[in-house]
Amino acid sequence: MTVTDNPADTAGEATAGRPAFVSRSVLVTGGNRGIGLAIARRLAADGHKVAVTHRGSGAPDDLFGVQCDVTDSAAVDRAFKEVEEHQGPVEVLVANAGISKDAFLMRMTEERFEEVINTNLTGAFRCAQRASRTMQRKRFGRIIFIGSVSGMWGIGNQANYAAAKAGLIGMARSISRELAKAGVTANVVAPGYIDTEMTRALDERIQAGALDFIPAKRVGTAEEVAGAVSFLASEDASYIAGAVIPVDGGMGMGH
C-alpha cells in the first residue's frame, strides 16, 4: 500500500502481520463541531461509515447527521435507529457530547452540578447501553469515551466536570470487564489543553499560564485527539480494554 492509498480501497488486505482494515459503522456524539468533528472526519477519512449527532444545529454536508439530546433516553434510541437504517448497527461509538458549567465549589448549585453529570456521564451511559445491544449480538464493539485531563488531575472550579470525566474511566473499565469476552471493549481518550473555539476565547494570560503545566510547551490539536480515537477504533486495538490514553502533552502525567 502506498502512502497515497485510502485504507477503504485496500479493505480486506492484511499487510506485514497487521489485521486487514474493516470499514465499520461509527457514531460520534456531538460530532458536528470541535473535537467531535475532527474525530468524525478522521474516521471517515480512514474509510469508516460515520454518523454524528447534533442538538439541532445540523451536521456538515460530508457527514450523516442525526438530531439527539443525550439527556433523553428516547431521543438516544431514535438517533440510533436512524443511524442503523442509514448505515447498519453501530459498531464503534465515540461518546464525545459534553458541556461545561464551571463555578467555585461554594457557588456551584446542585442544578449546575447535575446538568453536567447528566450530559457528560449519564448521557455517555445512555449511548453506551444502547450501542451494546447490537455490539454483543455481533460480538464486536468499540466504545470510546472522550474524557479529559480534568478527570484525572482535578482542575479547580470543575467539581462537576471533573467528576463526570473521572466517572467515564470507571464506566469504561466496568464495561470492559463485563463485555470484553463478547468482543466489546471500552476505553477513554483524555485530551488536555486543546486548540478549540472555547480555548481560543480564553484570556491570553490564561492561555499562556496553561503552558506552564504542559511539558510539551504547546497546545494540542483536535486532529491529535482524533488520531488516538482512530487507533482505538481500528483492528489493531482489539486487545486494549479499560485503558486511558492521554492526549495532553504530558500535562496529566502520573495521574
From Swiss-Prot:
Class of this enzyme: oxidoreductase
Main localization, broad class: secreted
Known catalytic reactions: a (3R)-hydroxyacyl-[ACP] + NADP(+) = a 3-oxoacyl-[ACP] + NADPH + H(+); a (3R)-3-hydroxyacyl-CoA + NADP(+) = a 3-oxoacyl-CoA + NADPH + H(+); (3R)-3-hydroxybutanoyl-CoA + NADP(+) = acetoacetyl-CoA + NADPH + H(+); (3R)-hydroxyoctanoyl-CoA + NADP(+) = 3-oxooctanoyl-CoA + NADPH + H(+)
Cystine pairings recorded for this chain: none
EC number: 1.1.1.100, 1.1.1.36
Pathway: Lipid metabolism; mycolic acid biosynthesis
Subcellular localization, as worded in the UniProt entry: Secreted, Cell wall
Pfam families noted in UniProt: adh_short_C2 (PF13561)
Keyword Membrane: no
GO molecular function annotations of the record: 3-oxoacyl-[acyl-carrier-protein] reductase (NADPH) activity; acetoacetyl-CoA reductase activity; NADP binding
GO cellular component: extracellular region
Positions of the record's site feature: Important for activity: 148
Residues that coordinate or bind NADP(+): 32-35, 55, 69-70, 98, 161, 165, 194, 205
Subunit structure as annotated in this protein's UniProt entry: Homotetramer.
Domain statement: Upon NADPH binding, several residues are pushed away from the active site, allowing the enzyme to adopt an open conformation. The transition from an NADPH-bound to an NADP(+)-bound form is likely to facilitate release of the product.
Protein name: 3-oxoacyl-[acyl-carrier-protein] reductase MabA
Gene transcribed to yield this protein: mabA
